[in-house]
Every structure is written in C-alpha cells, then in structure tokens.
Regions:
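Post-transcriptional modification and biogenesis factors for structured RNAs
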Residues: 1-108
C-alpha cells in the first residue's frame, strides 16, 4: 500500500489478513480509525474530529460493519437523521462524511 506519508506505509500489505488487523496496525501508527455507523448514539458527525490523520470505515449496505471491525475502530460516528430514516446508502453516507472532512480541514 502506498501513501503520501511513507511512515504510514504498511509493512507487508499481503500480510494484512483482515480489515480489523489493518485498522489495528493503522492505529498503532497514529491514524484514528472511525466507523461510519448509523445506529450509534455516542457521537454525531459534527462532533467528530477529522483534522488529523484518519481512516473512515463504511460498511456494506446489507450487513453494515462487523463487530470485529467496530471494535478495531477508535470510535463510531453517525450522520444525524430523522427517526423515520434507517440509514443512507453507502455512496450518500461517504459523500456526507467527506464533505465534513473537507469542511473541517477548511478545503471548502
């Protein structure tokens, strides 16, 4: 895996067997791992800090994010939605998260 910052390069990408293992490796290197999770009540998107190095994990539209991956993340963050809306599709959720990242980093 290549990254603009060589210190974030994974030792051996072929050795990274699961997403959870990769997330734990990233956390050891100082990258905050954030799960985009529609059913968390701990933190909403505007309360999360995206100003530093971070990795945002999105689940698939059918099963979401596995418990193992959730546990490997630093925190879970939700997009606030009305009670009648269960979740957004992954493309829409990613767009909302990336807008917030850009806003916090003053790119927009």
């Amino acid at each position: 895996m290549r990254n603009a910052d060589p210190s974030l390069r994974l030792d051996d990408p072929a050795r990274q067997l699961t997403l959870a293992q990769t997330l734990r490796d990233l956390r050891k290197r100082g990258v905050r791992c954030i799960a985009a999770h529609p059913h968390t009540d701990k933190k909403i998107l505007s309360q999360a800090d995206f100003t530093g190095d971070c990795c945002i994990v999105f689940g698939n539209e059918g099963d979401g994010i596995s418990e193992e991956v959730l546990e490997a993340c630093d925190e879970a963050v939700a997009i606030p939605m009305p009670p009648t809306v269960d979740s957004l599709n992954v493309g829409a959720a990613a767009a909302v998260f990336l807008y917030e990242v850009a806003r916090q980093r003053k790119k927009i």
